[in-house]
Amino acid sequence: VSGPADAAATTSTLGGATGAADGDAPVLRAAPRDGVLTSIAAATSATAASDDLVGFAASACRAPLAESWLVGGASTTGANDLIELANPGSVPATVQLSVYGSQGVSTPPSGQNIVIAAGERRIVPLAGLLLGEESPVVRVVSSGAPVHAALQTSVTRVLLPGGVEQVAPTAKADTRLVMPGVQVIATAAGQAGTVLRLLAPGADATATVALIPVDAVTPAPASFDIPLTAGLPTSVDLTGNTAGAYTVEVSATAPVVGATWSTTGFGQGADFAWYAAAPEIADPSVVAVAPGSGASVVLAADAGDASVTLTPVEGG
C-alpha cells in the first residue's frame, strides 16, 4: 500500500465467492482529506508452485467500474480461466457478461443477470460462457452498483504447467492504446511468444501498430496496419522482432480494446503475462509496487518529450 502517511486507509474483505476459488478479496478505502480525494494505491502478488500450477502473478488495486473489458485468456483445452466479479459497494449489483469470439458477440445464459450482493464476489468460469475460444474478449456491464472485474488465467500444455496471470480490466474502448514494458523473447520457429489481441467492438476499423524499444538502443521496427472487423477479436504475432522490452502503441480509426500476451517460453518452468492498455497519467499519482524480484516502472510519453519525477512515498 502506498499513499500519504495520514491517509488513514482502511481494509476489509469480500466474501461469497462461488466457483473454483477460495479465500476473500481485500478492499482498500481512504476517506477524503479536507474535501479532496486521497491518492492511495495498493498491489499484491502471488507465486504458485504445484504440480499443475506454476507461475507468478501481480495485481494492482483498482476502483470498481460500471463497464469494463477483459482482454485475455482462452477457453480451449488446457486453459483454466476464471472471471472474478467483486462488489465493494453497499447495494447489490447486477452484471451482464458479453463474450466476443470468432463468431461475433453473444451473451450466454450463464452471463446474464448475475446478482452480486453488497460486499460479496462471484467467480464465473470463462469456459462456461464460450467453450473452445482461442481469443475471447469479455465486456462486463453492471447496474445498481459498479463492480471490479478481473480474469484469473492459467494454462497447462500436455500436463506441463505453462504459467498463471491476473488480467487487469480496461475501462473503455479508445482510438489509442498504449502498453508499456511488453517483453518480446526469442522463440523457436512456429512458436508465437508475444501476441497482440485487438477488438473493435462497434465498427470496422484499421489499427496501426507501433513497437517502440524501451532501451532506445534497439532499432524500432516499422509500424504496420491491421484491418479489424467489428465484433471479431484479432490476434497479431509480434514474435519476429528483436528480443527486448517494447512499448506497444495502437492507433485506430474507431474505438478498440486490446492487450498483449508474452511468455517466457514453452517448456518446464515457463510463465506468461498479459499487458493491458495503461491508463493515461495526467495528474500527480501514486503507484504501489507489488512484492517480487526485478520490479521496474515503465513510462511512455504519448506525444513528444515529457519530464516525470518519481518520489518514494513514506511507507511505500
Kindly give the residue locations of the regions a language model identified:
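Long, internal scaffold/assembly segments composed of regular secondary structure
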Residues: 168-254
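Conserved functional hotspot residues at active sites or interaction interfaces
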Residues: 1, 44-84, 147-201, 256-304
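Intrinsically disordered, low-complexity linker/loop segments enriched in Gly/Pro
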Residues: 67-76, 89-116, 124, 175-186
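Hydrophobic, ordered structural segments
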Residues: 18-55, 84, 88-93, 115-162, ...
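Intrinsically disordered, low-complexity Pro/Gly/Ser/Thr-rich segments with frequent PxxP/GP/PP motifs
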Residues: 5-24, 104-137, 217-245, 313-316
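Structural beta-strand/beta-sheet cores of well-ordered domains, especially the beta-sheet scaffolds
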Residues: 81, 93, 112, 122, ...
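Extracytoplasmic low-complexity, Pro/Thr/Ser/Ala/Gly-rich segments
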Residues: 1-37, 171-183, 286
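Short acidic, flexible loop segments centered on an aromatic residue
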Residues: 85-107, 142-143, 192-219, 251-252, ...
